[in-house]
Amino acid sequence: MGNTFNRTYSKRRSTFNFDLTKDFDMDAFKNVIKLFSSNMPSKQFEFPYQIDILDWSDRQLRKDIFYGTMPRDPADHWARFNNQTLSPVLVCFTHCFDPEPYIASLEIGMALMALTYLLQSNGFLTSFCQCIEDPNSLGSRITGKDNTTLRVILPVGQHAYPEGTPSIPNPFGEPIQKKCNILQLDTPN
């Protein structure tokens, strides 16, 4: 266990530019999700969060998430979109009790850590997106329930564009520039 954790920890990365032209192994992803969901603990077995997994079946929702998650760049300007959300799959965490219990954000953090570790140790690339412009509206659209707040998105893929790729295709038709980040370690698989 220690060697596996140390190896994964030392090779951790955040992927911003997922390559959608290569196949995504949905069966392997589902196996990781099954393993995660059957082993994740919760305080008093309440699970104060809900997890929704989005593929590309609802392109309009994915486009709204793409334009509704706008990170800041180093110069303190808002970007118009978030490349991370173009991943093959988005794992969306929302709280599911009203009012939100104090423990919800802690449990979401623990679940994110566990899921990220499982995914990366099984060959998946991940990222992290919490810069959500209207978390209430997106949360309600994702879950189909009113008064739901989207807390965090975990983009998941298996392939990234190689370093030095000047731009990536936008599935919505507009050209986008590749996000550059010195700490980014996008690696093609």
Predicted regions and their residues:
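N-terminal amphipathic, basic helical "cap/leader" segment at the start of enzyme domains
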Residues: 1-89, 186-189
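C-terminal helix-cap and adjacent tail motif
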Residues: 4-15, 20, 24, 149-189
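Small-aliphatic-rich amphipathic alpha-helix that forms the alpha element of a beta-alpha
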Residues: 32, 36-37, 91, 96-141
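Short, charged/polar surface micro-motifs in flexible loops or helix N-caps
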Residues: 56-61, 97-99, 160
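Short, hinge-like loop/turn segments at secondary-structure boundaries
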Residues: 68-70, 144-147
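Generic beta-strand structural signal
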Residues: 87-89, 122, 148-152
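Short proline/glycine-enriched turn/loop segments at secondary-structure junctions
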Residues: 139-146, 167
